[in-house]
């Protein structure tokens, strides 16, 4: 169980605890089969190479799931993910170690709701930041 984060206890610049994953073909194949994304570029090396890619690569659902783990693991059971956006700008291939991180970029109250904007990103050792992302979350306040 994740310790609950409260709006009152964070400030702009607060770091969201990150995590890393080593990517391998099995991890990619399991994710794409589980999400029924059977496009061969995610599991067939020859097909991926014929398309100009050096290897198979992770798909959109994989990235969304990893960011969901990052942000929802941080906000706790009483937090609420209101908006999420990501931009897949670079590829993540087998052999890459992906690191998911974030920080608080803004906090405010709107219509009585305690809101936090978060800058999130995924990076690997080859490309640096591969997927910049954004989340708007609602957090409980200690004063309530």
Which ranges hold each PLM region?
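Hydrophobic residues in beta-strands and at strand termini
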Residues: 23, 88, 137-139
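Hot-dog-fold acyl-thioester-processing enzymes
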Residues: 2-80, 144
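Well-ordered beta-strand positions in beta-sheet-rich domains
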Residues: 20, 85, 132-136
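Mid-chain, well-packed structural core segment of small domains
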Residues: 73-96
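HotDog/MaoC-like acyl-thioester-processing domains
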Residues: 1-15, 92-144
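Arginine residue identity/basic-tract feature
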Residues: 27, 69, 85, 89-90, ...
């Amino acid at each position: 169980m994740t310790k609950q984060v409260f709006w009152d206890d964070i400030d702009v610049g607060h770091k969201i605890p990150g995590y890393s994953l080593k990517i391998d073909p099995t991890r990619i194949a399991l994710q794409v089969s589980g999400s029924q994304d059977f496009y061969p570029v995610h599991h067939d090396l020859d097909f991926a190479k014929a398309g100009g890619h050096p290897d198979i690569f992770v798909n959109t659902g994989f990235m969304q799931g990893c960011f969901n783990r990052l942000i929802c693991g941080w906000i706790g059971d009483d937090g609420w993910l209101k908006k999420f956006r990501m931009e897949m700008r670079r590829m993540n291939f087998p052999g890459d170690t992906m690191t998911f991180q974030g920080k608080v970029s803004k906090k405010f109250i709107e219509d009585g709701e305690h809101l936090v904007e978060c800058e999130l990103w995924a990076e690997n050792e080859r490309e640096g930041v591969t997927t910049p992302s954004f989340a708007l979350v609602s957090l409980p306040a200690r004063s309530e």
